[in-house]
Amino acid sequence: MERTIRRFWPRARSKVYEEPKNLVAHGLARATKDAVGRRTRTIYSITPEGRRALAAWLTTPGEPPVLEWEQLVKVFFAEHGTRADLLAHLEQIRQWADARDAEDAVFNLEFLQTRGPFPQRAAQNVLFGRFMSDWHTMIATWAQWATTVVLAWPDDMSRAEPDLDAVRSLVERRIARTATRLEGKYGPP
């Protein structure tokens, strides 16, 4: 769980361990006991009814992503704190992203050697791995950019001026993405 679904679908451990029991209760999974040394573990497997339910669920649209991140909330309200506090939060964000990047590198090297812990779904794992790696890189890049911007601000952050070049760059990137998408859809002008 720590290296797979938990990275994008975080839930309390108690909830994660409770859910398979619910699937068994609804006939969507089967539970078998297995001895590991002195301990007994439960192995869950999907039933034919569970496969049908999963296939039906996969045809439905999913909910859009939700971003819930306390450090980003602190960046949002930073004018009520100190510049030093904001810089510290940005550094924590960058360090978090760099640590995840390092984990991603280890996962990717292991994957090249063994196809990972679930070789039967290696192709799907590459899609997920690329997304997570790109996301962590984007966060680290953003945190570095934001740090550079904040370092140029006065200590009284209420007097900071917005980086209009950054806004122009966002507008230009959006226009370029839209043009590329339209060109791909309709061909060159």
PLM region descriptions:
Residues 15, 35, 42, 122-133:
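Alpha-helical scaffold segments that form or flank carboxylate-/histidine-based iron centers
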Residues 146-164:
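Long amphipathic alpha-helical coiled-coil segments
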